[in-house]
């Protein structure tokens, strides 16, 4: 009689932190509160956050997502997404007599303010980011004559500045930390006097989620990142997992997108989610994996997050006014 070989226990390593960051949480709640406060429709310029499920859920509640301000009927309410907008967009909204609610993430606003400040001092600003991303378009719009985009280390050779003693780098908030520093190092080799921003532009949540996914990659044969294909921070997490040694890593919006073939020979699955992803989607993946024998779930914690941001000021003002009116009755 042959000896029985024990099957290795299948398990899931669940990253913590994962999912919603403070800026996304604030933006999503802002749309929900605006719908409650003013009624549908609430127009939102671009997807409020880059997640298919979140956008579809808010559409069902009465949010209408538009690509350009001209699509918003005059006199309506328009909310700007968490990614931020250029000053020209604020001007367009004023021209159309739109009531605006600015749900730009405060960490993106910080980069906007840095751009304005350095442009005022006549610096050449090298903005590290991905061409066409809404956040990059918004930041570039703050100082179009001073900002040039650097889309990775391979772009550095083409960068030219007016005065090498007055150059500063800024970055999109959702990039790979490692790749950004590689770009910065290349820029510093070319421009030794390159100035750095006063504090990191890459946001705390992006950094924390990348650190967590690196930890998963140490032990998992497969890493699944829940997130949308247009989510910069989610895409970066797949890249970071592969760079950190994970044999395979994939991005999915929903559990139904997972290919059973990915699990072949896999005993340990690493699971995390992008900063725009509600936990209900991660729960769906856990359930799907559980049905296939990956019932043992172990949380891998690499950081605590307690940051919260207050709602956009326009919304806070109206909510306060309503509360005051109710208490006066």
UniProtKB/Swiss-Prot annotation:
Broad EC category = oxidoreductase
Q: In which pathway does it act?
A: Isoprenoid biosynthesis; dimethylallyl diphosphate biosynthesis; dimethylallyl diphosphate from (2E)-4-hydroxy-3-methylbutenyl diphosphate: step 1/1; Isoprenoid biosynthesis; isopentenyl diphosphate biosynthesis via DXP pathway; isopentenyl diphosphate from 1-deoxy-D-xylulose 5-phosphate: step 6/6
Whether S-adenosyl-L-methionine counts among this entry's keywords is no
Which GO molecular function entries does the Swiss-Prot or TrEMBL record give? Answer: 4 iron, 4 sulfur cluster binding; 4-hydroxy-3-methylbut-2-enyl diphosphate reductase activity; metal ion binding
**Where, by residue number, is the active site?**
135 (proton donor)
Q: Where does [4Fe-4S] cluster bind?
A: 21, 105, 203
Keywords tagged on the record: 4Fe-4S, Iron, Iron-sulfur, Isoprene biosynthesis, Metal-binding, Oxidoreductase
Instruction: Note the Pfam families from the entry.
Output: LYTB
Q: Where is the signal peptide?
A: none
Task: State the family it belongs to.
Answer: Belongs to the IspH family.
Protein name, UniProt field: 4-hydroxy-3-methylbut-2-enyl diphosphate reductase
Q: Give the organism the record lists.
A: Streptomyces griseus subsp. griseus (strain JCM 4626 / CBS 651.72 / NBRC 13350 / KCC S-0626 / ISP 5235)
As recorded in Swiss-Prot or TrEMBL, the protein's gene is named: ispH
């Amino acid at each position: 009689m042959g000896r029985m070989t024990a099957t290795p226990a299948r398990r899931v390593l669940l990253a913590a932190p994962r999912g919603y960051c403070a800026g996304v949480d604030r933006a999503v709640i802002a749309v929900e509160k605006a719908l409650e406060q003013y009624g549908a429709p609430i127009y939102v310029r671009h997807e409020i956050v880059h997640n298919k499920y979140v956008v579809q859920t808010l559409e069902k509640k009465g949010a209408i997502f538009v690509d350009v301000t001209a699509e918003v009927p005059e006199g309506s309410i328009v909310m700007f997404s968490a990614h931020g907008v250029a000053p020209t967009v604020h001007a367009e909204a004023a021209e159309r007599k739109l009531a605006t609610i600015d749900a730009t993430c405060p960490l993106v606003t910080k980069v906007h303010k840095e751009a304005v400040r350095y442009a005022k001092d006549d610096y050449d600003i090298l903005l590290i980011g991905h061409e066409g991303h809404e956040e990059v378009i918004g930041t570039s719009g703050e100082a179009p004559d001073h900002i040039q985009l650097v889309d990775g280390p391979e772009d550095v050779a083409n960068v030219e500045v007016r005065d090498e003693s007055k150059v500063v780098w800024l970055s999109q908030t959702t990039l790979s930390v490692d790749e950004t520093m590689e770009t910065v190092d290349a820029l510093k080799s070319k421009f030794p006097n390159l100035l750095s921003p006063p504090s990191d532009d890459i946001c705390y949540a992006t950094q924390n989620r990348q650190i967590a996914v690196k930890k998963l990659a140490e032990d998992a044969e497969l890493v699944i990142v829940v997130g949308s294909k247009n989510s910069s921070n989610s895409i970066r997490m797949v890249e970071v997992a592969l760079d950190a040694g994970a044999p395979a890593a994939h991005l999915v919006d929903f559990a139904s997108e997972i290919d059973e073939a990915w699990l072949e020979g896999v005993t340990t699955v690493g699971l995390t989610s992008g900063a725009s992803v509600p936990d209900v989607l991660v729960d769906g993946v856990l359930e799907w994996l559980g049905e296939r024998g990956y019932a043992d779930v172990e949380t891998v914690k690499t950081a605590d997050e307690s940051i919260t941001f207050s709602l956009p000021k326009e919304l806070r003002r109206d909510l306060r006014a309503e509360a005051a009116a109710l208490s006066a009755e």
